[in-house]
Design a protein with these regions (language model features):
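C-terminal and inter-domain tail/linker signature
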Residues: 1-140
Length: 140
């Protein structure tokens, strides 16, 4: 079975919800790219991404900051699955994550402020965190 964009995004969401890169790492292409609309330089390899993300996940863990990665769907600009990221509170939406898959590997991930995370349909699934999945449909 070939890797889909949705499966790639679920692995990314699981990484962010568990602060553990082990599920995502084997899915990354060696020439993987990671881009953010808030960062000038694009990361252009799997090894450079791992050098970047592992300390970032450790810093989040040590700070005690709350991060939520929820599966979502975009209908307009980039129709298809996405991850909706929130920080501090699960409804404090900060970014949308999009994935591109080629040859069974994740070729790139893009963190975007446009399209707005508020334009994404949120489906209440938080891969890697069963406690958060129990919150489906609940309103704060």
């Amino acid at each position: 079975m070939s890797l889909t964009a949705e499966q790639a995004l679920r692995a990314y969401a699981a990484m962010m919800n568990t602060l553990d890169v082990s599920e995502l790492e084997p899915l990354l292409a060696d020439d993987f790219h990671y881009a953010s609309q808030w960062v000038f330089a694009e990361i252009e390899s799997k090894s450079a991404f791992l050098d970047y993300i592992v300390p970032k996940l450790d810093a989040i863990r040590k700070s005690g900051a709350s991060v939520w990665a929820e599966m979502g769907w975009l209908d307009r600009e980039f129709p298809g699955p996405c991850v909706v990221m929130a920080q501090g509170d699960k409804d404090n939406l900060i970014t949308v994550v999009l994935a591109k898959v080629e040859c069974g590997k994740i070729k790139r991930l893009d963190l975007c402020g446009a399209p707005s995370p508020n334009s994404a349909g949120r489906i209440g699934e938080y891969p890697g965190n069963n406690d958060l999945e129990c919150l489906k449909g609940e309103q704060p």
